Amino acid sequence: SAGFKAGVKDYRLTYYTPDYETKDTDILAAFRVTPQPGVPAEEAGAAVAAESSTGTWTTVWTDGLTSLDRYKGRCYHIEAVVGEENQYIAYVAYPLDLFEEGSVTNMFTSIVGNVFGFKALRALRLEDLRIPPSYSKTFQGPPHGIQVERDKLNKYGRPLLGCTIKPKLGLSAKNYGRAVYECLRGGLDFTKDDENVNSQPFMRWRDRFLFCAEAIYKAQAETGEIKGHYLNATAGTCEEMIKRAVFARELGVPIVMHDYLTGGFTANTTLAHYCRDNGLLLHIHRAMHAVIDRQKNHGMHFRVLAKALRMSGGDHIHAGTVVGELEGEREMTLGFVDLLRDDYIEKDRSRGIFFTQDWVSMPGVLPVASGGIHVWHMPALTEIFGDDSVLQFGGGTLGHPWGNAPGAVANRVALEACVQARNEGRDLAREGNEIIREACNWSPELAAACEVWKEIKFEFEPVDKT
């Protein structure tokens, strides 16, 4: 038979191409590959390239009907991971034609699809992706971005302050709205629905939206500042999600929220388009991310999920804290914080960035620091995250001994003190505690907060330092 030989052949014969020069239009991926014993690194890397692009386990005669050279993924470089036995970084280049325009869903179905269950691999982790401008330009991206958000809110020169309303489940809509009002009245910019607040028997979504809108307008009238509450529009169907977003728009509130991993990228992109068309900001929560990103040798690093979110669309996204209860190693966290905010990010392996990423004109996303943080953390957070961030204190506001509003006052005073000290040229890292103590002298609310949280630390070694 001419030109076709049935049977199984090594992937590396076709898909391992160390001489390949990557194109500007290729999507590049860096995989951490742990081959099964006896499987050579080149074969494992080639298998990843094949199974996430055009390959299948055997030769098929329909290969002759297309141009493999044009469409196949290529493993173009492999390097051993220093300090790890039998772990390699395999670099794979994918031709742009393999992916549907404007669909994170399709991109992930290929790149992190079936290949993760592949038998020749003991484990596989996607560490980073390089998205070429020729692909990122097919996405709308964030509904508004950092600059437009500041203009909408009329807040400049400092991080924004938020608070998740607790207890996360069980409050009635009226009491929930009351808690929102107190926090906003005290000086916060935003309050937040918890990620698992959708529309449960104790509080249906429409009631919550109404009482929260009332709280926002009352707090705005009293403070003269623009306020917001992240109304969680996440729902069981896309239609229901959009219905909730429409109601939020009708109420005239500035921002809604979505759980982008549990809701899914298709739903998220749908909502992001609606938000841009209707002037709503979109806050993104990353519930379920640790299922995907916490294992060091398998899954996907959060920096990839963060890039995907910037493409799919969101104006805020949770990004760990570096200092609180939820995990985050400083350099790695700052690496993907930059990937969210900046236009152009240089390759820097010490920060986990495997590829130079050029977002061209795609708007940036505000990173949200949230989880176990309180007033004593304020200098570190201001120093680490800078102005373009949202600092979110849940228990750190509502746990104040005098109530929610004084808790909000304490956080706002601490933030303003840190920003002023920084602008005066003081060193927040060294003088942080002193700056907070000085501010306590003219804010009894802050003094009370400092007393409550003076000893609390979450001291665990982070799991993932890579």
Curated annotation (Swiss-Prot):
Entry binding sites for substrate: 114, 164, 168, 286, 318, 370
Binding site for Mg(2+): 192, 194-195
N6,N6,N6-trimethyllysine: residues carrying this PTM: 5
Active site: residue positions: 166 (proton acceptor), 285 (proton acceptor)
Location relative to the cell: Plastid, Chloroplast
One biological process term in Gene Ontology: photorespiration
NCBIfam families in alphabetical order: PRK04208.1
Protein name, entry field: Ribulose bisphosphate carboxylase large chain
Organism: Isophysis tasmanica
